[in-house]
Structure formats: structure tokens, C-alpha cells
Design a protein with these regions (language model features):
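Short, surface-exposed "cap/lid" segments of acyl-processing enzymes
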Residues: 34-75
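Short beta-strand/loop motif that positions the catalytic acidic residue
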Residues: 157-158, 162-165, 169
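Alpha/beta-hydrolase active-site loop
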Residues: 88-109
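N-terminal cap/lid segment of alpha/beta-hydrolase-fold proteins
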Residues: 1-36
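Gly/Ala-rich beta-loop-alpha elbow adjacent to hydrolase catalytic centers
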Residues: 117-126
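Catalytic histidine-centered segment of alpha/beta-hydrolase-like enzymes
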Residues: 86, 196-208
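Acidic catalytic loop of the alpha/beta-hydrolase fold
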Residues: 167-172, 198-199
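Catalytic histidine neighborhood in serine/cysteine hydrolases
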Residues: 183-199
Length: 222
């Protein structure tokens, strides 16, 4: 797998250290641009063993698009990534990490509805958590259907759910994602992006637009 492109942190990022089941979890909280809505979105990063982190450009663009819609965002590093303690645990420990981050968000931002989002491996982890943590909405970007991660027996949310998939994805089969979405009893909205690779090279602005358009109807009144 090609190493994920990275993002250079700016001073706008507010660093956090959250207590997690494997030790401290490195995170970054960002207020929305302009008028703030009572929503907080947690965005999960791609596979740690392939260079995935909260600084991945798809993750940061997702967070940027949401902030432009008035949504606060929280990115974090799974165990063993960056300053987060612990070691990779094939998704189960990472799910526990997300649970801990959700717990922090609920305690510190109890006035906000909780959205979950994720890219690739992060899309799988966030989907696994969505029903349990009562997420109010879900964004899944290039969910790794047909890869190493089983989508069988995952409780599926009945909340607003957006799936974005590049048609030229060299890692996740766009056809497999389309078939999976079509097989669901209550399928999410699927947006297919022509010419987009797994990491959305030269398509990040298009991704930003797809996210903004996709969540517009979910936004509460200011």
C-alpha cells in the first residue's frame, strides 16, 4: 500500500492528550470557521501500519470541510501512532481508542451532537462504533470493503450516513463498495468520484465539496 500523504500541522490545531485504554491518546481539537453549530465530528485516520495518522490529508480535508460548515472537529492518533501510547491491535484496540475519545467528547462537549467520520481503516472503525456510541451522523470515505476487515455483523446505523468512494481507487474496489451499499436494507447515500484514487490525489478539493454538499441537510439551525 502506498504511504498516506501527510499534512503539516498549523498553530490552529489545539493539541490534546486524552486518557485511553493503552495510555495517552494524542488528539487535536479545532473550532469551526465562523458561526459554530452544536455539532462535534470525530474523524478517524487510515491504517496505522501503512503510515496513517490524524495528519493524513484526506482526514484533514474532511475536518476542514466540516469546520467550514460550522462543525467542530476532533482528530486523534490511534494507539502506537505519533504520541499515542500502545501498539497496533488489528482494529479491536483502535475501536477502544475511539470509545475513549467519544467519552472525552461527551464529557467536554455535552451540548453538541456527535458525528463520526473515517477514511479507509478509519471508516471501518468508526462504522463499528456508530450504533454503540449513538452517533447522530456518519461519514465513511473509501470504506475498505473486500479487504482484511470484515463488514459482516456490524450493527448498521439508521442515522444520516454518507459514503464517498473514488472510482479509480487502487486499494479499495469501487465496485465492491457499490455492491455492499446496495445490499444494505437502509443504504447510505453513495457519492462516487470519477478519477479519484484511494488518497484522492489532485481530488482533495472535490472531496471537500462532496462532504460539504453531503452534510448540508444534516446541519441544525444556528
Amino acid at each position: 500500500m502506498t504511504e498516506a500523504p501527510q499534512y503539516t500541522p498549523t498553530r490552529a490545531d489545539l493539541p490534546l492528550s486524552i486518557a485511553g485504554p493503552a495510555g495517552r491518546i494524542e488528539a487535536a481539537f479545532d473550532q469551526p470557521d465562523g458561526l459554530a453549530l452544536p455539532v462535534l465530528a470525530i474523524v478517524c485516520h487510515p491504517l496505522p501500519t501503512e503510515g496513517g495518522s490524524m495528519h493524513n490529508k484526506v482526514v484533514t480535508m474532511t475536518a476542514r470541510a466540516l469546520r467550514e460548515c460550522g462543525v467542530a472537529t476532533l482528530r486523534f492518533n490511534f494507539r502506537g501512532v505519533g504520541q499515542s501510547e500502545g501498539t497496533f491491535d488489528d482494529g479491536d484496540g483502535e475501536l477502544d481508542d475511539l470509545r475513549a475519545v467519544v467519552g472525552w467528547a461527551r464529557a467536554e462537549h455535552s451540548d453538541k451532537a456527535l458525528w463520526l467520520g473515517g477514511f479507509s481503516f478509519g471508516a471501518w472503525v468508526s462504522l463499528r462504533a456508530a450504533v454503540e456510541v449513538q452517533a447522530a451522523a456518519l461519514i465513511s470515505i473509501a470504506p475498505p470493503v473486500g479487504r482484511s476487515w470484515s463488514f459482516d455483523d456490524i450493527p448498521l446505523p439508521s442515522v444520516p450516513w454518507l459514503v464517498i468512494q473514488g472510482d479509480d481507487d487502487e486499494i479499495v474496489s469501487a465496485g465492491a463498495v457499490q455492491d455492499w451499499v446496495a445490499s444494505l436494507t437502509h443504504p447510505p447515500e453513495l457519492v462516487r468520484m470519477p478519477g479519484a484514487s484511494h488518497f484522492f490525489h489532485r481530488k482533495l478539493i472535490d472531496l471537500r465539496g462532496a462532504i460539504r454538499s453531503g452534510v448540508r441537510s444534516w446541519l441544525p439551525e444556528a
